[in-house]
Amino acid sequence: MASKIRKVTNQNMRINSSLSKSSTFSTRLRITDSYLSSPSVTELAPLTLTTGDDFTVTLSVTPTMNSLESQVICPRAYDCKERIPPNQHIVSLELTYHPASIEPTATGSPETRDPDPSAYA
């Protein structure tokens, strides 16, 4: 059930306020084994959350495995060598910036300029 998302814990999430067009923000979340015991845990992957018109957040679950640490996308600010208990899964959270949704709307832009200035002559 979607309500079980409350069991997700995240204490290291940071969002760069100067994301560029091609920037992707990723962080590491953990879901406890009590949550993963649900047979419908796969319903969480993928889960897309909307945080406004400019960003799309995608949440996906990766099961814990021996080679997991080499597959984790981790920002430089975090310690990617941290040991992950076998009773936990990794949840990847991606924040993608969509510049097309914040086009300039200031006066004088092509959207607001009079198409025929000579009409006022």
UniProtKB/Swiss-Prot annotation:
Biased composition (Basic and acidic residues): 111-121
Gene Ontology CC entries for this record: mitochondrion
Region (Disordered): 101-121
Keyword tags: Mitochondrion
Claim: Mitochondrion is one of the keywords in the record: yes
Compartments reported by the entry: Mitochondrion
Protein's name in the database: Uncharacterized mitochondrial protein AtMg00130
